[in-house]
Amino acid sequence: MDKLIIVGGVPLNGSIRISGAKNAVLPILAATLLIEEPVILSNIPHLNDVTTMIELLGRMGAQITIDERMSIEVDCSQIQNVHASYELVKTMRASILVLGPLLSRFGKAEVSLPGGCAIGSRPVDVHIDGMRALGADIELVDGFIHATVEGRLKGAELNLGKITVTGTENLIMAATLAEGQTIIHNAACEPEVQDLANFLNKMGARISGAGTDTIVIDGVDRLSGGSYSILPDRIEAGTYLVAAAMTRGHVRIRDVFPKTLGAVLEKLHEAGARVKIGENWVDLDMQGRRAKAVDIVTAPYPEMPTDMQAQFMALNVVAEGQAVITETVFENRFMHVHELQRMGADIKLQGSKALIRGKEKLTGAPVMATDLRASAGLVLAGLMARGNTIVDRIYHIDRGYECIEEKLAQLGAEIRRVSSHVYAARYAAQKRWL
């Protein structure tokens, strides 16, 4: 198991390119199951979750070709089975996204209940209730969702009980080949939902309203193949901007959609950053100043994403002043707090709130990642800690960040990846000399 070793205290400076969005490419890969012709996808991030989704499609019979630029051709014309095994689904919650397209195109699906990050209850009730409203028969048997439909799914008016990104995406895909019109109320508005709709529309779907809380899908008989480029990852972009702010640096991120970063940029400006925006870039300069503490309340888009909560917590623990972070999207998403406290952070938890008093510096320590975004927060904290910070269980971070140590090193950070057996050997050697 790999670890990251970080020597803190270096301001980040320079320019990096932002990768394609993990939360956009996964539903779009699942959506290729709706299409009988080859699809070429570009701007694909090299991530463990993407590899898992590709393997899942491959086991179903999809023919997949990857070139040296990480463009992917997916041909789902010869799908042989509609079974998504527990072995793969347990590692990634987004695997549930194959349910809608399998059911819509093939009239049946067997999908294991998902796994993924341990950050609270994220039930699939919205997915199942929506599929049933579209005419599917669904049973839960031995940890699997067994879904069937006679003929085609039928369009319906759906009122989602809670805002859910994957639930909205799954129901969009299910409705794309359904008979008649489907209207989704209380739909998620995230840019990744819009990207899925844009992709499907380019392949021949008839979807309107994506980006609002009411999405209308007029079902079509079939989709055609084509090519599509995945939108940039706003969470990766936000992570590097926060890293620059908390290290008092000056960083430009390229190949981004600044309009998707509104809430993040607003808080970074409030923290004292000078922010400039271009068509596809953002420039952040702290001019050597310490960041000011900022209150954060997570909420669905266009408000502050819950996936940026841990990063802003890392900023606040070394910022000037006090801040309150309120988590409204997921329960149990403060598991990184105890690890930050090991580094000297002054954080007190009160239910869904974290009360933070900023310190000038943290102290490096061994810490353990508990989920994808928590691991990013710990890496950022390590950038401002005295001495060495060792982040363990970084397989979490590899699920959502492409080459994070290389990009941070490109900006001047002292960071390296080592395998556990190499680290253990070095630690043992050091002890012999003590």
From Swiss-Prot:
Keywords: Cell cycle, Cell division, Cell shape, Cell wall biogenesis/degradation, Cytoplasm, Peptidoglycan synthesis, Pyruvate, Transferase. The keyword Nucleotidyltransferase does not apply. It comes from the Bacteria. It is found in: Cytoplasm. Its EC number is 2.5.1.7. Signal peptide: none annotated. Coiled coil: none annotated. GO terms for biological process: cell division; cell wall organization; peptidoglycan biosynthetic process; regulation of cell shape; UDP-N-acetylgalactosamine biosynthetic process. Cell wall formation. Adds enolpyruvyl to UDP-N-acetylglucosamine. This is UDP-N-acetylglucosamine 1-carboxyvinyltransferase.
